[in-house]
Amino acid sequence: MPSLLVLTFSACVLLGWALLADCTGGGGSGGAGPGRGRREREALPPQKIEVLVLLPQDDSYLFSLARVRPAIEYALRTVEGNATGRRLLPAGTRFQVAYEDSDCGNRALFSLVDRVAAARGAKPDLILGPVCEYAAAPVARLASHWDLPMLSAGALAAGFQHKDTEYSHLTRVAPSYAKMGEMMLALFRHHQWSRAVLVYSDDKLERNCFFTLEGVHEVFQEEGLHTSAYNFDETKDLDLEDIVRHIQASERVVIMCASSDTIRGIMLAAHRHGMTSGDYAFFNIELFNSSFYGDGSWKRGDKHDFEAKQAYSSLQTITLLRTVKPEFEKFSMEVKSSVEKQGLSEEDYVNMFVEGFHDAILLYVLALREVLRAGYSKKDGGKIIQQTWNRTFEGIAGQVSIDANGDRYGDFSVIAMTDTEAGTQEVIGDYFGKEGRFEMRPNVKYPWGPLKLRIDETRMVEHTNSSPCKASGGLEESAVTGIVVGALLGAGLLMAFYFFRKKYRITIERRNQQEESNVGKHRELREDSIRSHFSVA
C-alpha cells in the first residue's frame, strides 16, 4: 500500500523553503506572546483574511472548484453579515479568496509555494483543501512548518490522523474513513459478528474505496475482528462470477465499496448463486452522499429490474446521516443555481464536500474570533487550529462535532429494503459518532425478517487477502496460517514415523530370531540337495 507517510517533497520545494526562509526569517511557531497579539489586535480593523482554496478544476471530481465555490461564497456572506445582518468578526474584516487548481496532485503544493514566492514571502492566513490524499499530504506538512491553519473536507485516509508532528495544523471537517470504520464496528457489535470480507474497487489513482476500507480494516484490527479482502479495477472488464466465488470462499458478511452499477452487478450475480436468502449479509458504503457510489437503488428500467429488486432485499447501504432544516434547503437551492450556471446538471448538487467546505469557513471564523479575543492574531496558526479542535458548532446541515484530534465525528445511517414487494427502502438504524452509539429505529420492518439471517462464522474458509489488510513489514495472515498448519503436519509426520519405525524394528527382531532358529535346517536341506545333485551327476 503506498503510504501517505512516505510521500516526500520535490527538490524544487526544498529550494523554495530555503528562499522563503531568507525572505521571512522562517515560519512562526504558533507560540507568539500575548504582547505581539495585543499589538496586532489593536491594528486589526480594517484587515483582510487571505484564503487559498486548493481544489481541482476538473469537474469529474465531486469536489471540483465549480461545485464547492458557491458553498464557500455562501458561507462568507454569512460570516461577513451580508446574509444575516449579524457579523461574526470585527467590522472592517474582509476575506480575500484565491482559487487554485490542485489537479489532485503535486500542483497543489506548487501552487502554494509559487504563490508565497510571488508575494515575497507573504503567506495566506488559511488553506482550504486539498481533498485528494496524495495532494493533501505535502501541503499539510508545509502548513505545519509555516504555522498555517489548514481545513479540509478531504484528506480522509487513516494516515492523516497522526497530528502530533507533520499534520499538526490540519483539521478535517468531514468524517474520516476511520470514523466510518467505527460505525461499522458498532454495527458488528450490535449483530455480534466478528468476521467480514472487504470487496472494493481500486483504480490505483485516487483510491477512494481503498482508503475507505483501509479505515474499516484498521478499526477492526485494533478490536480483534477478522477481515479478508478482494479488490478489482472498475476501469477494466469485470468478472462478476470471480468476485462472487471469492465471496463464497471467504466470509458471510460482505462490506462493499464501488460504483452503483458495479454494486448492482455483484448483487445480481450473488442472487443467481443463491446468496441472497439470508445466509449472507451485504453492506454497501455510499461515499460522500453521492449516488455515483452504490446508493441502494436497484431500478434501472431494464430486464434485470425484478431480479435486482429481489437481490437488494439482502443489501444494506451505509450513508451519512441526513438532516433537513430550512436553512439547508435555502443553501441547497443557491448552490444548485450557481452550479447549473457553470453548465453542470446532476442530482448531487450538495454532497459531503460541498457541506464540509461551507462549515470549514464557519469553524475557522469561530476559532479566529476566540484567538483574537485572547490577544493573538490571525497569524497565530497553531492557536487558531487548536481552537477548531474538541468543539461542537451548528453547521449548514446540523450540528458538527470535532474531536480532540481535529477530526470530525461521523453520524451515519443504515438504509435497507423494508418492502420487498414494492422494493422501497428506508433508514432502519443510525449511528451517532460522538456518543459511539448505534440504534435500530423503532417500528421499521427488519430487512431479513425475524431470525432470517443465518450466518455461521465458525465454518472453515479460504481467504484471499489482497488489500489494505496487511501490515507493512509483517507476515500476512495466510502466511502465518501456512506456517502453523505446516508445523502441525510436520509434527504429525514425525510422530507417525517414530511409531512406525518402532513397530517395524520389533517385527524385524522377531523375524531375525525365527530365521536364526531355522537357518541350520535350511543349510542342511541345501547341502543335502547339492549332494544329491552331485550324486546324480
Curated annotation (Swiss-Prot):
Where mainly found? membrane
The record's annotation in PROSITE patterns points to: ANF_RECEPTORS
* GO BP, one annotated term: regulation of blood pressure
Glycosylation annotated at which residues? Answer: N82, N289, N390
Tell me the keywords, alphabetical order.
Cell membrane, Disulfide bond, Glycoprotein, Membrane, Receptor, Signal, Transmembrane, Transmembrane helix
Cytoplasmic-side segments: 501-537
Highest taxon of source: Eukaryota
Q: Which residues lie on this side of the membrane: Extracellular?
A: 42-477
> Can you supply one Gene Ontology CC term for this chain's record?
plasma membrane
State its location(s): Cell membrane
Check the record and name the InterPro entries matching this protein.
ANF_lig-bd_rcpt (IPR001828), ANP_Clearance_Receptor (IPR052612), ANPR/GUC (IPR001170), Peripla_BP_I (IPR028082)
What is the additional note?
Answer: Has low affinity for peptide hormones in the absence of bound chloride.
Please state what the protein is called. Answer: Atrial natriuretic peptide receptor 3
Q: Which organism is it from?
A: Bos taurus
